A protein has these predicted regions:
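N-terminal phosphate/diphosphate-binding loop that engages ATP/GTP or pyrophosphate donors
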Residues: 21-90
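Conserved catalytic-core segment of NTP-binding enzymes
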Residues: 107-111, 116-199
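Short, hydrophobic alpha-helical segments
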Residues: 196-209
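Phosphate-binding/switch loop-helix module in NTP-utilizing enzymes
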Residues: 85-119
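Conserved beta-strand elements of the Class I
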Residues: 5, 30-34, 130
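Glycine-rich phosphate-binding P-loop
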Residues: 5-22
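Phosphate-binding P-loop
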Residues: 1
Length: 209
């Protein structure tokens, strides 16, 4: 069972669009999709809203998406064709507490695609793609930590003359990795699809449910 992880250096760079695009492009894999969100202090994992709870039962929430309206990220995964879609929420730095639940989900899936950087601390995927936008300055520590584990880079197209907005960030760890230029709103190009298909070819997806 292959596990594909899609990461990125910050919010709103297209990670969800890449996951949805790959699900739609490779339906034979009958994907189970997971989105992992880590909230800062003072935010409840149960609903993502501000709260002052410090109880253990509010530090972790795992829910299966059933809504197919396409309004939420996990709903978009279902609309794209995922067999199942899960949303995992934990407090910042508490992802380890969610791993038993995540591993249980993965054990029952045919193929999994996960939107997260931090999960690389606990899982060695069969494929890790990172989405980078040179015009967005924020660069998560988790994205920088695991940059050297990326099998390929999906790089937002920018004018050559522009200097990346990142500060103190080196892309040397991925200089020798395949880099695919993306032009939103198209996040998954035919080249990206073929790269992923080729890397997962040894798993030969089945055509049955």
């Amino acid at each position: 069972m292959p596990v594909v992880i899609i990461g990125g250096h910050t919010r709103s760079v297209g990670k969800t669009s890449v996951v949805a695009g790959l699900i739609a492009a490779l339906p034979a894999f009958h994907w189970t999709a997971l989105k992992i969100t880590q909230y800062g202090h003072g935010v409840c994992s149960a609903n993502g809203e501000a709260c002052d709870c410090v109880t253990a039962d509010h530090s972790l929430a795992v829910s299966e998406e059933k809504d197919r309206s396409g309004e939420s990220d996990t709903s978009r995964f279902l609309v794209a064709g995922a067999d199942h879609s899960w949303w995992v929420r934990t407090q910042q730095g508490h992802l380890a507490e969610a791993m038993p639940r995540i591993r249980k989900i993965l054990a029952t899936t045919q193929n999994a695609i996960i939107e997260s950087n931090s999960i690389l601390r606990f899982i060695k995927p069969d494929l890790y793609l990172t989405v980078l936008d040179p015009e967005t300055a924020d660069f998560k520590a988790s994205a920088q930590t695991y940059l050297d584990r990326a099998d390929a880079v999906l790089l937002h197209s920018v004018e050559n003359s522009k200097t990346p907005a990142w500060e103190r960030v080196s892309l040397k760890p991925v200089m020798d990795r395949p880099t695919f230029e993306i032009h939103p709103p198209t996040y998954v190009t035919p080249e990206v699809i073929e790269f992923v298909r080729a890397r997962l070819s040894r798993f030969s997806p089945t055509s049955h449910h």
